[in-house]
Amino acid sequence: MDALQALVLGALQGITEWLPVSSEGQTMLAMISWLGMRPTDALSCSIFLHTGTMLAVLVRFRSRLLGMLNTESKLMRTVIVATLFTGITGVPLYMLFRDRFTGGEQATLLIGSLLIATGLMLRLRSSSTKDMEEISTKDMVLLGLAQGFSILPGVSRSGTTLTVLLMRGVKQDDALMVSFIISVPAVLGAIALDCLAGSPLSIRSLPGAVMLASSFITGYATMDVLMRFSRNVSFSWFCITMGMITLALTALPEVQ
C-alpha cells in the first residue's frame, strides 16, 4: 500500500463512517478488490482506519466528553450501559464471523427502510422528541445491543444506532451526538479484540500515518456537515433523508 492509496482509503472511511452505510464494509471491499488484500487483512486494516474517525470524535466533542467525567452525567451513563450491551452482542459475533466476510446489503437496506418508515410515521402524527437527559435505560440497552451487530462487515454502526435512537424519539442532533460518542469505546474494543485475535496485518509507518490523517480530517468535516444539517431540517424529514441516502448508496455497487 502506497501513500496515495492510504489517502483514498482514509477519505473513504471518514466520509462513510457517519453515513448510515457500513464504512467497514466499503473500505473492506475497496481493499479486497482494489489492493488484492485477503479478507482477514482487510478487516484488520478497516478496524485500524476507525482510529482516525475516533480521534475526530474526541476533538469535536471534547467539551462534552470532559463533562462526562461527572459520574452523574446522563451521557456518561448512556456510554457505559450501551458499551456493556455492545459487548454482549459484538464479542460473540466477532469471534464467529471474523473470517467470514459478507456484504451485508440486506441489513443496510433494512436500516434505510426503517429510517424512511420512521420519518413517514412522524409526518402523520405529532410526536414529542426526547433530549439527552430524557434517554431511558431501555433506550441505552437497545442502543448497545444494536451497536454490537455492527461488528459484522456490511452492517452500518452509525445507521443502526441512529435508527434505534430516532425510533425511540430522541432528537436528531442529540441522536447524532450520542451515536458519534458511543463509537469511541466501540472502536477501542474492536481494536483490542483484533489484537487479541492475533491480527496478521502489518502497516508501514507512512501509509498508516496518511490513513489516520485522512480519516481524521474527512471524518471531522463529515460530522460537522451532518450536525449542521440535523439542526436545519424537521425531525421527520431528517429520518426520510437519511433513509434515502442509505438506499441510494446501497444501490451504487450494483450500478457500477
Swiss-Prot record:
GO function terms (MF aspect): undecaprenyl-diphosphatase activity
Catalysed reactions listed for this entry: di-trans,octa-cis-undecaprenyl diphosphate + H2O = di-trans,octa-cis-undecaprenyl phosphate + phosphate + H(+)
Enzyme class: hydrolase
Main location: membrane
Residue stretches spanning the membrane: 39-59, 77-97, 101-121, 135-155, 176-196, 206-226, 233-253
Topology in the lipid bilayer: Multi-pass membrane protein
Record keywords, A-Z: Cell membrane, Hydrolase, Membrane, Transmembrane, Transmembrane helix
Cysteine-cysteine disulfides: none
Cellular component per GO, a single term: plasma membrane
Cited InterPro entries: UppP
Pfam families reported in the protein's UniProt record: BacA
Localization terms from the record: Cell membrane
EC numbers, comma separated: 3.6.1.27
Family to which the UniProt record says this protein belongs: Belongs to the UppP family.
Function: Catalyzes the dephosphorylation of undecaprenyl diphosphate (UPP).
Name listed for the protein in its UniProt record: Undecaprenyl-diphosphatase
Organism: Methanothrix thermoacetophila (strain DSM 6194 / JCM 14653 / NBRC 101360 / PT) (Methanosaeta thermophila)
Gene this chain is encoded by: uppP
